[in-house]
Swiss-Prot record:
Its cofactor is Mg(2+); Mn(2+). It catalyses: Exonucleolytic cleavage in the 3'- to 5'-direction to yield nucleoside 5'-phosphates. This is DNA-(apurinic or apyrimidinic site) endonuclease 2. Belongs to the DNA repair enzymes AP/ExoA family. GO terms for cellular component: nucleus. Mg(2+) 1 binds at residues 59, 353.
């Protein structure tokens, strides 16, 4: 992390609420990267590092047996939604800091209500053997369920909410946080596109409904929509629009106004127009008049800032050249525009193909006074939703299953070896057993008559030199050795070729790939 980003994160006062969104692409895997690798898989350490008060992670890719680790974070309320059937997929978490009682934000950050999904049709426990939908329980549901979609029946609504894509939390200060991971239709199927558009429409209809009943909205997460032309490196290149240092986004959009508008209203990408219709700062005049949300990052950084990307294609190694798009947002109601004090992306934070985005809001006069009555913790809080209060029962069962499998493996290995010293290794771990066989050449192997003598000899395999097989790598236009790749196309499957080893970037960027290509 750069020193400039450290300064940004440190510049937060006690009176501001820091919102942070991060598509972690697997909550376990991002702990493999600095600085998180030194945090012992502690979410509390991660949240303190960011100095964040309200955090949402997308693509948790976790399951019920692992939620005990992420659903009980000291000093935070935890709200987690995971897919109902598909394991290791999607998943959204929202964590709310619990300040000390003498902290200025203590009353403002009190959680009033919380719910899972966007339609209100999902249910929450209502006693030992019963459950009730959020929309039918005024004590749990946040509201705004009317006219979400005229064709949306209960079955369709439950399908929309079955993939663990949204968590909503209402605070005592009147803010409703909507943590979301919108579908992307990565397979480009007709069914996937219909699901994507319906989810987006229902979500934004719910936002409007909540706004009408007086709620202040913070919509944060991976929306999977690139809102403007200046937010898409790929489209800028397709339109042959050069990005030079003196040219800012404002000048670019003025010079290529038609292309900037076409990018939004393109009939092949209806999700962009749908998304822009909720934005008060949209380039579309009609949309901006009806828009009710402000893009905090764009407001603070202005439209003049280019290359403000939040996601990159990692398979093509496009992050080093900053060739990506912006699909992660923190959007707030117009009512909160005056509260926005800071907002930015953190592109130097690794651990995912996305980077974190944060916004600082000072709620000023909207702050709740100390006399406010504290309400019960919502039933959707992870400790209640997933039964994490009673000695971590889920984790106990997980350990039990693991031990059974381990014992089964030990039995099978011992039976196959069938040696005279089985009794001596019965209580040893599987790892130490294999280590001894491979590293110390256990005497039991010598005693076996079934192993031929020639098997004991080391077999030396001649090592082939890379250049002996493919020849010396040709030089690219940068004068550097090129990189060997394998074709995966149907026309030339498995055929080798050389390309420039630098990552793809803007066509006028001399530091990016020169476009060199040569078949082997």
């Amino acid at each position: 992390m750069s020193s400039s980003e450290n300064t940004l994160l440190d510049g937060k006062s006690e009176n501001t609420i820091r919102f942070l969104t991060f598509n972690v692409n697997g909550i376990r895997t991002f702990f493999h990267y600095q600085p998180f690798s030194q945090m012992n898989q502690s979410l509390r350490s991660v949240f303190d590092f960011f100095r964040a008060d309200i955090i949402t992670f997308q693509e948790l890719k976790t399951e019920k047996l692992s939620i005990s680790k992420w659903g009980r974070v000291d000093g935070f309320y935890s709200f987690i939604s995971i897919p109902q059937t598909r394991k290791g997929y999607s998943g959204v978490g929202c964590w709310i800091r619990i300040p000390e009682k003498n902290h200025p934000l203590y009353h403002a950050l009190q959680v009033v209500k919380a719910e899972e999904g966007i339609t209100g049709y999902l249910t929450i426990k209502n006693g030992k053997h019963s459950a009730i939908s959020y929309r039918n329980d005024v004590n749990q549901g946040i509201g705004g369920y009317d006219s979400l979609d005229p064709d949306l029946d209960e079955k369709s609504a439950l399908e929309l909410d079955s993939e663990g894509r949204c968590v909503m939390v209402e605070l005592a200060c009147g803010i409703v946080i909507i943590s979301v991971y919108c579908p992307a239709n990565s397979n480009s199927s007709e069914e996937g596109e219909m699901f994507r558009l319906r989810f987006l429409k229902v979500l934004l209809r719910r936002v409007r409904n909540l706004d009408k009943i007086g709620k202040k909205i913070v919509l944060m997460g991976d929306v999977n929509v690139c809102r403007d032309l200046i937010d898409s490196a790929d489209t800028l290149e397709q339109f042959s629009i050069p990005i030079t240092d003196p040219m800012g986004g404002t000048k670019l959009e003025a010079q290529y106004r038609d292309k900037a508008i076409q990018f939004i209203i393109n009939p092949d990408t209806p999700h962009r127009r749908i998304f822009n219709q909720i934005l008060a700062d949209s380039l579309l005049p009609d949309a901006s008049k009806r828009g009710i949300l402000i893009d905090t990052t764009r407001l603070i950084q202005t439209r003049n800032r280019l290359k403000m990307y939040t996601v990159w294609n990692m398979l093509k190694n496009l992050r080093p050249s900053n060739y990506g798009s912006r699909i992660d947002f923190i959007l707030v109601s117009l009512k909160l525009e005056r509260c926005i004090k800071a907002a930015d992306i953190l592109p130097d934070i690794l651990g995912s193909d996305h980077c974190p985005v944060y916004s600082d809001l000072d709620i000023l006069d909207d702050r709740i006074e100390p006399g406010t009555t504290q309400v019960p913790i919502p039933k959707f809080e992870a400790r209640y939703k997933y039964n994490l209060r009673n000695h971590n029962v889920l984790e106990m069962f997980a350990k039990k299953d693991t031990n059974k499998e381990s014992n089964k493996q030990k039995y099978c290995v011992s039976k196959v070896m069938n040696t005279k010293k089985n009794s001596n290794i019965k209580n040893k771990s599987l790892d130490s057993f294999f280590q001894k066989v491979n590293g110390e050449k256990d005497d039991r192997i010598k005693e076996s008559s079934e192993i031929p003598q020639q098997a004991k000899k080391r077999i030396s395999t001649p090592k082939l030199n890379f250049k002996d097989v493919f020849g010396k790598p040709p030089l690219c236009r940068h004068g550097e050795e090129s990189m060997l790749k394998t074709s995966k196309t149907s026309a030339n499957p498995g055929r080798k070729f050389w390309i420039c080893k630098r990552s793809r970037g803007d066509s006028n960027n001399t530091e990016s790939s020169c476009g060199f290509f040569q078949w082997v």
